[in-house]
Amino acid sequence: MVKAGCWFIDTFALCYSYRYLVTKHQQQKGLPMQNSQHALTLAQINALTEEQIDKKLRLALDNAIDRIDLTYEQMREVMLLIMTGKCNDARMGAMLTALRMKSESIDEITAAAAVMRELAERIEPANPERLVDIVGTGGDGANLFNVSTASALVAATAGVKVAKHGNRSVSGKSGSSDVLAQAGVKLDLSHDETLACLEQQNLGFLFAPNHHPAMRHAMPVRRALG
């Protein structure tokens, strides 16, 4: 079975810095820069008609099936349509599977990550430049133990402030929230409570449903794809 649909959910935190690295690579090599200046804004996406939405999603899916990489702008628009509930489950599953089968490009991954950042509910730590973000390895198919949670605990104990992103398990035996819940950790904290844990205990758990509410539109498909 093709393991599709998890890359843009379980690796988004890693992608935050990925765009920076790609930009540096393009500058060093003299390559053309991708940007979102021609992509639709969230307000424009919300104003699209059903016919316009269908046309955009159909073109993107046809390209992915033909193994043609989507541009940064095109992937951004597709991701906004997914995250605002304007892409039905059947088309979303087909899109994610087609992207996985052709192998996602740098611009596709970074565009998806950018949209997740745009729609995220954030916390504002006092010294964000001294903050470490550890995200899980869910969806990798390796069936590992919960490496990211163990790493977060070790780093926090060593004095590093860690913002640990995580969710319930999809592909493995236990996701980060499953492990922490069994240990008695309260997951449904307010943003202020999470920030207090981060500042006072060096570790704040950013439970995905609390900080990425737009992901509710993609979760049923994610679970179905495995």
Predicted segments, located by residue:
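Phosphate/diphosphate-binding glycine-rich loops and adjacent basic-rich segments that engage nucleotide
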Residues: E193-G226
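N-terminal cationic leader/targeting segments used for protein routing and processing
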Residues: A4, H25, K29-G30, S36, ...
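Acidic, glycine-rich active-site loops and adjacent beta-strand->loop/helix elements
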Residues: G136-G141, G166-G172, H211
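Short, Lys/Arg-enriched N-terminal segments with co-localized hydrophobic residues
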Residues: T11-P32
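A glycine-rich phosphate/pyrophosphate-binding beta-strand-loop-alpha-helix module
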Residues: L96, F145-E199
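Acidic, glycine/proline-rich low-complexity segments that act as flexible tails and inter-domain linkers
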Residues: Q34-N143, A158, V162
